[in-house]
A protein has these predicted regions:
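Thiamine diphosphate
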Residues: 2-20, 50-219
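Internal gly/pro-rich beta-alpha loop/helix module
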Residues: 7-28, 33-50
C-alpha cells in the first residue's frame, strides 16, 4: 500500500523506496502497475484494477496529499466516474518546449514548479503518469514534442552516478537518448532519512518544487 519515502516511520524500508523498480521488474507479468497521484486517482485505479483480469501492483499514496485540481480551478482533476488513463495532462502553458513528467504522488510539486517557471518566462507543461505500461509511442511522442527537454520526478530510488539511472527516470532516459535532454528528481542516496512526515522526508531527499525548477533550468 503506502510506498516511497512517505510510508511513515514504522514502515520505512528499502522495499518502500524501491517500489517503482520492483514494479518495473514484474511488469512483464502484470496487467498494469498503478501509481496514483492522490486519493481520487487511487479510487479510479482500484476501480480499473477490479474491472480487469491479470496481475496488478498499486502503490497507494498517503491520504494527506493534496487533491489535484484542474488548471482552471473548475474542480478536482479526477471524478469518481473518470476513466483510468496512463498519462494525464495536468498543466499546459503556451509556448512550452519543456515538460515535467511526474510519476504518482509528487505530481502536485510539478504544478508548483510550472507556476514558478511560468513567472520566470520558462513555460513548462506537466504530465502525470498514472501507471505503466504506457501506450505504444507515448514516451517517444513526448520526447519529440519537447525538444528543449524533459524532467522526471518520482518518490523512489532513481540510482546514482555509480550505478546508472533506474526507476521511471531510467525509462524516460532511455526513450530520450540522443533525442532530447533530460534531468531527474528522485532518491539517489537512500541510506539515511529523518523520522518525520513525508514532506520533510521528501525535502531531505531533494524531492521539492524548487528542485524541479532547478532541473528544468538545467536542461
Amino acid at each position: 500500500s503506502h510506498v516511497g519515502a512517505c510510508t511513515g516511520r514504522d514502515h520505512f524500508s528499502g522495499w518502500g523506496l524501491d517500489w517503482i523498480n520492483m514494479g518495473l521488474t514484474y511488469l512483464p507479468y502484470l496487467h498494469r502497475f498503478y501509481a496514483p497521484a492522490d486519493a481520487r486517482a487511487a479510487f479510479v485505479a482500484v476501480r480499473d484494477l477490479a474491472a480487469h483480469y491479470g496481475g496488478h501492483i498499486i502503490g497507494i499514496p498517503r491520504d494527506n496529499l493534496p487533491i489535484l485540481d484542474r488548471q482552471d480551478g473548475s474542480g478536482p482533476l479526477w471524478e469518481t466516474n473518470s476513466e483510468w488513463e496512463a498519462v494525464t495532462t495536468y498543466r499546459t502553458y503556451e509556448g512550452a518546449q519543456r515538460a515535467i513528467l511526474a510519476l504518482g504522488a509528487p505530481a502536485f510539486l510539478g504544478a508548483e514548479a510550472a507556476e514558478a517557471l511560468q513567472g520566470e518566462g520558462v513555460p513548462t507543461d506537466v504530465y502525470i503518469v498514472n501507471g505503466l505500461t504506457l501506450p505504444d509511442g507515448a514516451l517517444s511522442d513526448l520526447v519529440a514534442r519537447y525538444g528543449a527537454g524533459l524532467v522526471t520526478v518520482e518518490d523512489g530510488v532513481i540510482g546514482t552516478a555509480e550505478t546508472g539511472v533506474r526507476g521511471f527516470a531510467g525509462l524516460v532516459a532511455s526513450a530520450a537518448d540522443n533525442k532530447a535532454p533530460v534531468a531527474h528528481v528522485g532518491i539517489t542516496d537512500p541510506r539515511i532519512a529523518p523520522s518525520e512526515g513525508h514532506m520533510e522526508t521528501w525535502a531531505h531527499f531533494g524531492i521539492t518544487a524548487e528542485a524541479l525548477v532547478a532541473a528544468v533550468k538545467s536542461l
